[in-house]
Amino acid sequence: MFLLLAACAARPAGAQDEPRVQVFGGYSYTRFDSRSFGFSDSSGLNGYNFSPAFNLIRGFGVAAELSGQYGSKLNFRDLAVGPQFLYPRGKTLFFAHVLIGSARSFVRVGAGERDTERAVALGGGMDLDLTSRFAVRVFQVDYLHTTLFDEKQNNLRFSTGIVYHWGTLKRKGHRAPVQP
């Protein structure tokens, strides 16, 4: 994870333009650490991931994320925001983020239990441009740390989908000298 953050922070001289705004929507699968809830194994949850991001300067922006994953006896949703680091290479955009927010879980056992607690997501991924406005998020992987029901959960989320982007943060080049 730290290597991905370091790679995103290093800016080569020939870096490509970056999108000003990105909106991602897609499928997600979470391997949820539900053993702390009394389940015998971790739960495989399917759902969605939605993430708008606004890139402030080259290589850095702010991202928000809303996701929901659902299983037969367990639902999990999170909302988080934080810094995003970008590293464009040709038609590929690598990114890493650190998001902090809250998670909500509903366990359908007996009368059912709900809890909302803090959540931290550390992750990154890769987008591949299809057109000037659309890209496919080839992969996004997030480590999610939650503390639902006064227990720690270490979860892993995989996402893929479509990214819509507009506006660009252009590379600053040399200006031609003004002729008198």
Describe the role of every protein-language-model region:
Residues 1-8:
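Bacterial N-terminal signal peptides
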Residues 27-30, 101, 141-144:
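Generic short beta-strand segments
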Residues 13-56, 62, 66-68, 157-159, ...:
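Short glycine/proline- and aromatic-enriched beta-strand/turn motifs that initiate or cap beta-hairpins
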Residues 8-12, 123:
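Short stretches within intrinsically disordered, low-complexity N-terminal or propeptide regions
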Residues 35-45, 69-77, 110-111, 147-153:
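Solvent-exposed loop/turn segments connecting transmembrane beta-strands
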Residues 51-123, 128-130, 136, 140, ...:
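Gram-negative (and chloroplast) outer-membrane scaffold detector with strong preference
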Residues 131-180:
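Predominantly the C-terminal beta-signal and adjacent terminal strand-loop region
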